[in-house]
Curated annotation (Swiss-Prot):
Gene3D superfamilies: DNA-binding pseudobarrel domain. Residues 48-111 are annotated as: Disordered. This is B3 domain-containing protein At2g24670. Keywords: DNA-binding, Nucleus, Transcription, Transcription regulation. The keyword Flavoprotein does not apply. PANTHER family: B3 DOMAIN PLANT PROTEIN-RELATED, GAMMA-GLIADIN B. Residues 153-249 bind DNA. Residues 56-70 have a biased composition (Basic and acidic residues). GO terms for molecular function: DNA binding. It is found in: Nucleus. GO terms for cellular component: nucleus.
Amino acid sequence: MIFKKEVSKEDVECVETLLMMSNSKPTREEYNKLQLCILRRNKSSTITTPSTVMESKSHIHDHSLRESPTRRSRNRHDLPPMSPPMEQRKSKKAKRSTDASSSKTREPTPGWLISLMRSKNGGDVEDNSKKIIDKELFQTDVDPHQSRLSIPVSQIVELEFLNHEEKRAIEEDANRVRKEGVDAILVDSHLREFPVNLRLRDMRGILLYNLVAGWNQVVTDCLLEENTNIRLWSFHADDTLYFALVPLYAN
């Protein structure tokens, strides 16, 4: 048989103190109050019956359900900040993508290059120029022992700059240990001409065009150095492949 007995004042104080401590980090005052409640309860002769325990649990549950909005709000504010909205993250990603591809835009062909193409093509004013790349030269690009300008295929602005015969020569080179490449002429803005050779290489899965042969002379005569920014164009005249080099000096 179960006897009901009223919950003692000490028990109620203990429960209320525990409830406050469960919702947030206990303060020193709350901790001391709990210790005092326990001491008082131990000194009390009140006997707790099963029904008393059930009533105490019910009392705790009711208090939890009636938790004040202020306390709930405080707990929410303790949470770490939420991640940015999906639209904001997409916007940032798009901005990075735009920044990364900004060097792949097509600027107008320089006037001196149009005049050169006209003279090479017998007065024909058709602009068949292709923008190849904007690039900051690395140390290896100006190293005389390397003797080549590296052009990553993934960074080329207009990929269709080779004619049919040149493409076939590049494809046949793929199975050769000693590359033959495609002969070309590089012209600078002073209209100086340098014989060069274009070759395609696969560097561990990364496709690179290399300008070789006369590249060291280009570096010397055009005063190219590491960190120099250049823009490279191409065009055809009488079925000959030309490259046009434009150093991009800071203002």
